[in-house]
């Protein structure tokens, strides 16, 4: 069994395009945009995992990014950006946490990372 990295890449590209378009149109709030960006990042990471025949045993973005760093030349700065994304997730916490407000600066950083990861992933597609 393996991951069909081409399908994962294609889905990531669709989410990426949607995130960029929604940001330009201003049709959704930052929290919704954040989730679409995370879906895109998840798909790009899954595509990279498939390229190196790796099936993640955990679905967390940070876990997958860290494992990719062991299996390929994966930029350390991407791991930091994935951690930044995860910093806004509160739904897995056992304690009640007030959701963090996602600012325009945060969204710009997330979109920049998403585009960098997209380009990185596409450059490795054979």
Whereabouts are the PLM-identified features?
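Terminal alpha-helical segments
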Residues: 1-126
